[in-house]
UniProtKB/Swiss-Prot annotation, chain A:
Lineage: Bacteria, Bacillati, Bacillota, Bacilli, Bacillales
GO molecular function, one term: flavin adenine dinucleotide binding
Additional notes on this entry: The active site is a redox-active disulfide bond.
PROSITE patterns: PYRIDINE_REDOX_1
Coiled-coil stretches noted in the UniProt entry, renumbered to this chain: none
Record-listed NAD(+) binding positions: 177-181, 200, 263-266
Ligand binding (FAD): 30-38, 47, 112, 305, 313
Catalytic activity: N(6)-[(R)-dihydrolipoyl]-L-lysyl-[protein] + NAD(+) = N(6)-[(R)-lipoyl]-L-lysyl-[protein] + NADH + H(+)
Main EC class the enzyme belongs to: oxidoreductase
Assembly information from the UniProt record: Homodimer.
Residues of the active site: 437
Protein name: Dihydrolipoyl dehydrogenase
Cofactor details (free text): Binds 1 FAD per subunit.
SUPFAM superfamilies: FAD/NAD(P)-binding domain (SSF51905), FAD/NAD-linked reductases, dimerisation (C-terminal) domain (SSF55424)
Swiss-Prot record, chain B:
Catalytic residue positions: 371, 375
Keyword Acyltransferase tagged: yes
GO molecular function: dihydrolipoyllysine-residue acetyltransferase activity
Protein family membership: Belongs to the 2-oxoacid dehydrogenase family.
Domain Lipoyl-binding intervals: 2-77
Reaction equations catalysed: N(6)-[(R)-dihydrolipoyl]-L-lysyl-[protein] + acetyl-CoA = N(6)-[(R)-S(8)-acetyldihydrolipoyl]-L-lysyl-[protein] + CoA
Species: Bacillus subtilis (strain 168)
Stated name of the protein: Dihydrolipoyllysine-residue acetyltransferase component of acetoin cleaving system
N6-lipoyllysine carried by residues: 43
Top-level class of the enzyme under EC nomenclature: transferase
Pathway in which this enzyme or protein is active: Ketone degradation; acetoin degradation
Keyword Transferase annotated: yes
Cofactor or coenzyme needed: (R)-lipoate
Domain Peripheral subunit-binding (PSBD): 118-155
C-alpha cells in the first residue's frame, strides 16, 4: 500500500515519517527543497535574522550591563546575517533529508498533479512520470496573497520570501498588513536601521489577538521607530517613483520607499494540482477535510496550509501525523483545541486558547488573572521588563480557557500554558504548584494565582 | 493536635450512620460551628458542625458510607498537620450501650494504582457538579484519561436520554441508602409482622369547616397559628384515643401495651422521604396548643432540624394525603403502634337531611389497625367516636 504525499513541508514530511514508521511505503513529491515554507522561507530563516537583531539590541545596551564598547565598535553585516541564516536552514534541511533516508521514504523532486483518483503525474527535471498510489495526501502548502493592483515583482513589490534575501538592509520599507508577518518584519528591519512604515486596514495591529496585547506591542514598535498607520489602506503604487499611495479616512498620503512588502495573508497553494481530475472538493479557502483529515474522496487526505484554517507549522505537524496514522489504519482524530500562536516580535507575543474577547463572549464573567513582567525578578535582570501575562479562567470550574502573553521569551513560556490547558487543569491547582525562582515562568504562576485572587507579588 | 469528629449517636437504637454529603473537602478551612457534613440515620438527617476552627485535614468516611456511631469521620487541625491514627477500635461514646459497640473499622491502605481514576481536573469538577457517576464515564484522552469532552458528551447523552419517550430511556439505578433504606425496612417489617387492615368512614364536617373558617383568623392573630382541619382531626383523634385506648397501644413481645398518654406522630413528607415528628402528651394540649405543636414540629422536620428524640416514641400516628386529592387509602402501621389514621381530601357533595338535599362537606377517614391487638368492632367504635367529634365540633374547642 503506497501513500503518496504531495509537498515536503512540515505537514508533508511529518506525515511521511509517521507513515513510514507505521510500515507504509511512502512516496514524497516536492518541487523545491524539503522543509517547505517553514524551513526555507518562513519560520526558521525569519527567526534566524530576528535573532541577529536581538543580539544587536543587546549589544546596543551593553553599557547598561556594565560593558563598555569603543565608539563605532558596532557594525551590522547583513550578508553575514544572511549566511548564518542559510547555515541554520541548510542544517535543518539536511536533517529532514536524513529523516527521509532513515525512514526509507522515496523522495521525488517535481510538480505533482492528479490524473485520476489514484494516478499522479510528476513533472520534474528529468521529465515526466506517472505514479500510482493507494492513498494520496495533499500537503501543498500556501503562498502569499497578492494585491491585484500591485502584483509581486520580486524587485520592488516583495513577498515575505523576497524580503528575507534582500541584498542589503533597505533604508526604507513600506509594509502592507499589520498582522503576524508584517509585524515580525517591521520589528526586524526597524531594529536593523530601516525606516519602516506599516499600513494596516484594521484599527490596530494584530487584530486577531486581544487589544491590550496589541496596544502594548504597538507602543513598543513605535519606540523602535516604526511608523504605524492603522485604519489605513494602500490605494495604489507608483512603480517609477517608488511610492506607495495610501489613504487614511478621506486623506491620501504618499510614502516613498526602497521596497514595498505585501503581507496581507497566505492562501492555499492548489493551482496545478488538477484536483478536479480526482474529484476532490476545494475552494479558494482550501480543501475541506474531516477530523481524520480525509477529503470528500476518502483515500485522499489533505493537511497543513492547503486546508486553510490555522496555517501554523506546528498545527501542520499534528495534522500530518493524524492524516498518516489514519491512512495507516489507526482511528485517530485531530485535536486542535490548544494550538499556541507565537509572534516573534520584540517583545514577543504568545497566545493560546481563547482571547479575552472570545472568552467573555462565551463565558460572560470570566476570571482574568494578570501579572506584569515589571514585577518579575528575572525580567528585570534581563532588562526586558515590558509586557504581561494574562490568563482567562472559566468562572464556574476555573478551567484555563486562554492565555495571552507579551514579553521576554513568552514564545517559550507558552509551552507551559499549553501543557496546563491540554491537561485540563484548573486555576486553583496553581496553589499547589511551585515555579522556579528567579525565572520568567513565575509570571505565569502568579497570573494563575491572580485568577483566584491569590497572587503574591502583584 | 488534630480534633477528631465522630459519627454522633442519634437515639439509643442507632447502629449505623451514613455520611450523606461532605460540605467541605480535605484542605478546606472550617470555622467553629460551621456545617462540615450531613449525616443520615434512621429517619433523621442532621448537619455535623465543626467543633473547632481549623483545616479539614483528613476525611475517613466517604459519602454514602455507613459507620457505627463513635467512628471518626474526619479530623480538623492545622493545615500542615498529619493525623495520628488511634490504634484499635474507635472509642465508643460514654452513653453508648455495650450492645452496640462499634465494629472495628479496617484501616484501608491508600487507593492502589489500579483504583486511581485517570481524569482531568476540569472533567472531574464538571462531572461532580452534575452528579455524574465517574465510574460510568469512558475516557478518550491519552491512556483512557477522562477529559472534559467525555463529560460534556455524557451530560448531553443524559439530557437526550431524559428527553426520549419513557420507553426508550435507560433504566435508572438509585442505590437505597439513608432515609429511604430505613423507610423500606420499617414498612416491610410492618406489613410482614402484623395483621393490619384498613376500615374507612366519612365524616360530615360542614359545621367544622364553618367553625374552622371562623376561628382560624383569630387563632392566627392571637397565637400566631392558623387552625386547619388537620388540627381539629388531630384533636378529635386524641380525644377518641383516650376513650378507646386499645388503639393507643403497642403490640410487642406478644403483649398489648396500652398507653395512658397520647404521643401523636404526625407524618411529614420531605423531598426525599418522610419523617414522623412526635407531639408528646398530646392529651395535655388544648386545641390551640396542639395546633402550635403540629405546625412547629412539621417546620422543624422539613428544615431537617428535628432531633432524634422528637422523631421517636409515638403511640399513634396520623398521615394526611388530602392535599394530593386522595380520599380513602390504606396507611401502613408504624410499628409497634397498632393504629394509624389517614386523612383524605374533603369535598362538597349533596346530602339528604331528612327529605332535603343540602350541600355538605365530607371528610374521608381511613383507619389501619392491627387485628392482633384489636378487632373490627372496637376499631369501628373508635372511628365512630372520631366522626362524632368532627360532626359536633364544639367539644373539640374545650
Amino acid at each position: 500500500m503506497t501513500l503518496a504525499i504531495i509537498g515536503g513541508g512540515p505537514a508533508g514530511y511529518a506525515a511521511a515519517v509517521s507513515a513510514a514508521q507505521q510500515g507504509r511505503n511512502v512516496l514524497l513529491i516536492d518541487k523545491g527543497k524539503l522543509g517547505g515554507t517553514c524551513l526555507n522561507e518562513g519560520c526558521i530563516p525569519t527567526k534566524s535574522l530576528l535573532e541577529s537583531a536581538n543580539v544587536l539590541d543587546k549589544i546596543k545596551h551593553a553599557d547598561s550591563f556594565g560593558i563598555e564598547l569603543p565608539a563605532g565598535a558596532i557594525s551590522v553585516d547583513w550578508s553575514k546575517m544572511q549566511s548564518r541564516k542559510q547555515q541554520v536552514v541548510s542544517q535543518l534541511v539536511q536533517g529532514v533529508q536524513y529523516l527521509m533516508k532513515k525512514n526509507q521514504i522515496q523522495v521525488v523532486k517535481g510538480t505533482a498533479s492528479f490524473l485520476s483518483e489514484r494516478k499522479l503525474l510528476i513533472e520534474g527535471e528529468n521529465g515526466k512520470e506517472i505514479r500510482e498510489a493507494d492513498q494520496v495526501l495533499i500537503a501543498s502548502g500556501s503562498e502569499p496573497i497578492e494585491l491585484p493592483f500591485a502584483p509581486f515583482d520580486g524587485e520592488w513589490i516583495l513577498d515575505s520570501k523576497d524580503a528575507l534575501s534582500l541584498s542589503e538592509i533597505p533604508s526604507s520599507l513600506v509594509i502592507v498588513g499589520g498582522g503576524v508577518i508584517g509585524c515580525e518584519y517591521a520589528g526586524l528591519f526597524a531594529r536593523l536601521g530601516s525606516q519602516v512604515t506599516i499600513i494596516e486596514t484594521a484599527d490596530r495591529l494584530i487584530p486577531a489577538e486581544d487589544e491590550d496585547i496589541a496596544r502594548l506591542f504597538q507602543e513598543k514598535l513605535e519606540e523602535d521607530g516604526v511608523e504605524v498607520h492603522t485604519s489605513s489602506r494602500l490605494g495604489r503604487v507608483d512603480q517609477t517613483a517608488k511610492t506607495a499611495i495610501w489613504k487614511s479616512g478621506q486623506r491620501e498620503f504618499k510614502t516613498k520607499a526602497d521596497y514595498v512588502l505585501v503581507a496581507i495573508g497566505r492562501k492555499p497553494r492548489l493551482d496545478g494540482l488538477q484536483l478536479e481530475q480526482a474529484g476532490v472538493d476545494f475552494s479558494p479557502k482550501g480543501i475541506p477535510v474531516n477530523g481524520h483529515m480525509q477529503t470528500n474522496v476518502p483515500h485522499i487526505y489533505a493537511c497543513g496550509d492547503a486546508i486553510g484554517g490555522i496555517q501554523l507549522a506546528h498545527a501542520a505537524f499534528h495534522e500530518g501525523i493524524i492524516a498518516a496514522s489514519h491512512a495507516s489504519g489507526r482511528d485517530v482524530k485531530i485535536n486542535e483545541k490548544h494550538v499556541p500562536r507565537c509572534i516573534y516580535t520584540s517583545p514577543e507575543i504568545a497566545c493560546i486558547g481563547m482571547t479575552e474577547r472570545q472568552a467573555r463572549s462565551i463565558y460572560g464573567d470570566v476570571k482574568i488573572g494578570e501579572f506584569s513582567f515589571s514585577a518579575n525578578g528575572k525580567a528585570l535582570i534581563k532588562q526586558q521588563a515590558e509586557g504581561k501575562v494574562k490568563i482567562m479562567a472559566e468562572p464556574e470550574f476555573g478551567e484555563i480557557v486562554g492565555v495571552s502573553m507579551i514579553g521576554p521569551d513568552v514564545t517559550e513560556l507558552i509551552g507551559q500554558a499549553a501543557a496546563i490547558m491540554n491537561g485540563e487543569m484548573t486555576a486553583d491547582m496553581a496553589e499547589h504548584f511551585i515555579a522556579a525562582h528567579p525565572t520568567l515562568s513565575e509570571t505565569l504562576h502568579e497570573a494563575l494565582l491572580s485568577t483566584i485572587g491569590l497572587a503574591v507579588h502583584a | 493536635m488534630a480534633v477528631k469528629v465522630v459519627m454522633p449517636k442519634l437515639g439509643m437504637a442507632m447502629k449505623q450512620g451514613e455520611v450523606s454529603i461532605w460540605n467541605k473537602k480535605v484542605g478546606d478551612p472550617v470555622e467553629k460551628g460551621e456545617s462540615i457534613a450531613s449525616i443520615q440515620s434512621e429517619k433523621i438527617e442532621m448537619e455535623i458542625e465543626a467543633p473547632e476552627k481549623g483545616t479539614l485535614i483528613d476525611i475517613k468516611v466517604k459519602e454514602g458510607e455507613e459507620v457505627p456511631p463513635g467512628t471518626a469521620i474526619c479530623y480538623i487541625g492545622d493545615a500542615n498537620e498529619s493525623v495520628q491514627e488511634e490504634a484499635g477500635a474507635p472509642v465508643a461514646e460514654d452513653n453508648m450501650p455495650q450492645a452496640v459497640q462499634p465494629v472495628k473499622q479496617e484501616n484501608k491502605p491508600a487507593a492502589s494504582k489500579k483504583d486511581r481514576m485517570k481524569i482531568s481536573p476540569v472533567a472531574r469538577k464538571i462531572a461532580e457538579k452534575a452528579g455524574l457517576d465517574l465510574k460510568q464515564l469512558k475516557g478518550t484522552g491519552p491512556g483512557g484519561r477522562i477529559v472534559k469532552d467525555d463529560v460534556t458528551k455524557a451530560l448531553a447523552e443524559q439530557k437526550k436520554d431524559q428527553a426520549k419517550p419513557v420507553s426508550e430511556q435507560k433504566a435508572q439505578e438509585i442505590p437505597v441508602t439513608g432515609m429511604r433504606k430505613v423507610i423500606a425496612a420499617r414498612m416491610q417489617e410492618s406489613l410482614a409482622n402484623s395483621a393490619q387492615l384498613t376500615i374507612t368512614m366519612k365524616a360530615d364536617i360542614t359545621k367544622l369547616a364553618t367553625l374552622q373558617k371562623q376561628l382560624s383568623p383569630t387563632a392566627e392573630e392571637r397565637y400566631g397559628t392558623k387552625l386547619t382541619i388537620t388540627h381539629f382531626v388531630s384533636r378529635a383523634a386524641v380525644l377518641a384515643l383516650q376513650a378507646h385506648p386499645v388503639l393507643n397501644s403497642f403490640y410487642q413481645n406478644e403483649r398489648i401495651i396500652t398507653h395512658p398518654h397520647v404521643h401523636l406522630g404526625m407524618a411529614v413528607a420531605l423531598e426525599n422521604g418522610l419523617v414522623v415528628p412526635v407531639i408528646r402528651h398530646a392529651e395535655k394540649l388544648s386545641l390551640i396548643e396542639l395546633a402550635q405543636s403540629i405546625s412547629e414540629n412539621a417546620k422543624k422536620a422539613r428544615e431537617g432540624r428535628a432531633g432524634s428524640e422528637e422523631l421517636q416514641g409515638s403511640t399513634f400516628s396520623i398521615t394526611n394525603l388530602g392535599a394530593f386529592g386522595v380520599e380513602h387509602f390504606t396507611p401502613i402501621l408504624n410499628p409497634p403502634e397498632t393504629g394509624i389514621l389517614g386523612i383524605g381530601a374533603s369535598y362538597d357533595t349533596p346530602v339528604y337531611q331528612g327529605e332535603e338535599i343540602v350541600r355538605s362537606t365530607i371528610l374521608p377517614l381511613s383507619l389501619t389497625f392491627d387485628h392482633r391487638a384489636c378487632d373490627g368492632a372496637p376499631a369501628a367504635a373508635f372511628l365512630k367516636a372520631m366522626k362524632t367529634y368532627l360532626e359536633e365540633p364544639a367539644a373539640l374547642i374545650l
